[in-house]
Design a protein with these regions (language model features):
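A short helix-to-beta-strand connector/capping loop
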Residues: 4-5, 111-116, 129-131
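Catalytic core of the metallo-beta-lactamase
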Residues: 6-12, 18-27, 124-133
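Pre-active-site segment of Zn-dependent metallo-hydrolases
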Residues: 15-20, 27-70, 82-90, 94, ...
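N-terminal Rossmann-fold NAD(P) dinucleotide-binding loop
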Residues: 77
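Short acidic-hydrophobic, aromatic-tinged amphipathic segments that line or gate anion-handling sites
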Residues: 116-122
Length: 133
């Protein structure tokens, strides 16, 4: 039986590299992802337009994924959202400014209507299963 008090931290990108920021936190039956960024390809990656995090871990546990929290609106933190939300369509929490940036991006990809973007005001706390953010 798994220890339900153990916090698992799973980096899907952004460690030891510039860009592709995405960190997953898992506690019992709840998963929260922080950021969803892209990375621009290295020069030797001919024909590749952008690099996104491997979200297999999230897709395989979709029933446990409560949300994606966005720290700020830079591409290395929001750029992969149009690609990730196609398979992991969960609420996305962000500040008002970041909401505007994400909205434009999702509209360009024709995903704005089916996406669940939520604004978090300064000082506001949100409850996501066992997580408080």
């Amino acid at each position: 039986m798994a220890d339900h008090q153990t916090l698992r931290v799973i980096p899907l990108g952004g460690l030891g590299e510039i860009g592709k920021n995405m960190m997953v936190f898992e506690l019992a039956d709840d998963i929260v992802a922080v950021d969803c960024g892209l990375q621009f390809p290295e020069a030797e990656m001919l024909g590749v337009d952008l690099v996104i995090p491997d979200t297999t871990y999230l897709r395989e546990r979709l029933d446990k994924v409560r949300a994606i929290l966005i720290t700020h609106g830079h591409e290395d933190h929001i750029g992969a959202l149009p690609y990730v939300l196609r398979d992991v369509n969960v609420p996305v929490y962000c500040t008002r400014l970041t909401y505007g940036l994400i909205s434009v991006k999702l509209k360009e990809h024709r995903l704005l209507r089916e996406s669940d973007l939520r604004i978090v005001e300064p000082g506001e706390q949100i409850q996501l299963g066992d997580f408080t953010a």
